[in-house]
């Protein structure tokens, strides 16, 4: 019997959900992910005792199938509800109608059940899809894979997908029309803690659009107090070529401007550049 294999490029939520469904149908699946970890933007940065959910801040469940997945994760202790005090600009914001869910102990816990019993190659970037008579071969960092895949699912940001799929038909060339927005994320730890007026704050204008006290989330370290800031897409695009140190310094100053006060020197600060955030 022919050994039929499928490849999935990208180990974020979409890629792992695809791989999981293929595996449930008894297909042989291999996932390739250029990052070392799973989850894509469902990410938590850990530095010693500190934890920053520096990608997606929470998830909501709106589809029936995803709600079932969330219920399974909740029963397994991999999910918890976050009910922060929220402000928008300088006004209190009503509590969300739908629950905000976070992964436990980190955001990537939401996708780990999807990855069970699936062959995953982390830290491996796929650079080219090579058609053959029986399917597809993959060119990666480590060279040409000695495997023929019947089909390949590409679950990566549009610019990366375009580079892989563009040479294989006009329909794929439309991917180049997709424009994705970047996001600089700032990560700051304070000891003693600061009072920003709420656990999560939104701003409708200015460099920062979101600030969240990560320490207000269930299961996250309480001390030192950790904060995550998301810059606007416009500010992020304008400063896309900064290094992380310079970006963190600017984001801290912008946070002070938003709060209207000087903040103590953080015991830790860093920044992460999401080139393809939204």
What are these regions (language model features)?
Residues 1-14:
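Beta1/beta-strand and adjacent pyrophosphate-binding region of the FAD-binding site
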Residues 249, 253-278:
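Flavin (FAD/FMN) cofactor-binding core of flavoprotein oxidoreductases
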Residues 9, 20-48:
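Glycine-rich FAD pyrophosphate-binding loop
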Residues 39, 145-201, 261-264:
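Central helical "cap/lid" subdomain
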Residues 187-242, 246-260:
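Active-site substrate-recognition segment that forms the wall
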Residues 122-137:
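A conserved short coil-to-beta-strand element within the FAD-binding core of flavoproteins
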Residues 58-65, 83, 87, 91-113, ...:
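Short beta-strand to alpha-helix junction loop
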Residues 21, 43-86:
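N-terminal FAD cofactor-binding segment of flavoenzymes
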């Amino acid at each position: 019997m022919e050994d039929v294999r499928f490849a999935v490029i990208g180990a974020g939520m979409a890629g792992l959900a695809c791989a999981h469904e293929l595996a449930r149908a008894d297909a042989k699946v291999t996932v390739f992910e250029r990052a070392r970890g799973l989850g894509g933007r469902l990410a938590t940065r850990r530095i010693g005792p500190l934890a920053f959910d520096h990608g997606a801040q929470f998830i909501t469940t709106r589809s029936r199938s995803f709600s079932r997945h969330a219920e399974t994760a909740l029963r397994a202790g991999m999910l918890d509800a976050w009910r922060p005090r929220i402000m928008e600009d300088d006004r209190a914001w009503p509590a969300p109608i739908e629950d905000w869910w976070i992964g436990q102990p980190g955001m990537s816990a939401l996708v780990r059940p999807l990855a069970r019993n699936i062959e995953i190659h982390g830290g491996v970037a796929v650079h080219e899809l090579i058609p053959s008579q029986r399917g597809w071969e993959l060119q990666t960092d480590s060279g040409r894979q000695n495997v023929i895949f019947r089909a390949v699912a590409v679950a990566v940001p549009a610019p990366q997908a375009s580079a892989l799929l563009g040479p294989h038909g006009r329909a794929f060339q439309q991917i180049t029309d997709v424009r994705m927005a970047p996001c600089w994320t700032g990560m700051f730890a304070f000891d003693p803690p600061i009072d920003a007026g709420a656990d999560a704050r939104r701003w409708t204008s200015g460099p920062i659009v979101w600030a969240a006290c990560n320490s207000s989330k269930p299961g996250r370290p309480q001390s030192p107090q950790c904060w995550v800031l998301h810059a606007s897409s416009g500010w992020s695009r304008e400063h896309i070529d900064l290094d992380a140190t310079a970006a963190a310094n600017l984001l801290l100053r912008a946070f002070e401007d938003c709060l209207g006060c000087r903040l103590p020197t953080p015991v830790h600060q860093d920044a992460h550049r999401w080139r393809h955030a939204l």
